[in-house]
Amino acid sequence: MRVLALTGSHDRNGFECGVEALNLWLRQAALQHQAKGISRTFAAVPLDLKETKAYRAAGYPDIVEHSILGYYALASAFILADELPAELAKRYPRQVPVTRLGRLAIRNDLHGQGLGRLLLADAVTRSRNAALSVGSAGIFVDAKNDAAARYYKQYGFTHCKDDPLKLYLPMW
């Protein structure tokens, strides 16, 4: 598997994660947001023809070279310091530059195989690399539900003040 910037050649219409809003956003908005500089989307795709054949042999006959196995989107944002956990808020000025992890989705039939962990690690790495050139104190995410919040917490994200679905991971 490799993670690439989303392009028009990736099969957005064949992606199904089980959450219609995430499917529709990928199909209808992701490339438009990239063109406007709003966000950047990164897609996990099969590494090569050999890996594509391995997926097919493992019971995934519809996975082809340009199939999207999972994706995430990143954007620059600001949050107010008083939204952060109290122990972190005191370290920052009133407005804190962050990288927003706007979406993270995995193909429905690939859930539970570690792909989400790999995409999250890629998102953190890209965010840290970008923060070396453009300031960002951490990664901010709005979890869609309690299960998603628990998922992010197991990778070091902490709840923001007054909202258990808003989570933050300091970069430094």
Summary of predicted features, one role per range:
Residues 1-113, 117-172:
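Non-catalytic substrate-recognition and accessory regions of acyl/acetyltransferase enzymes
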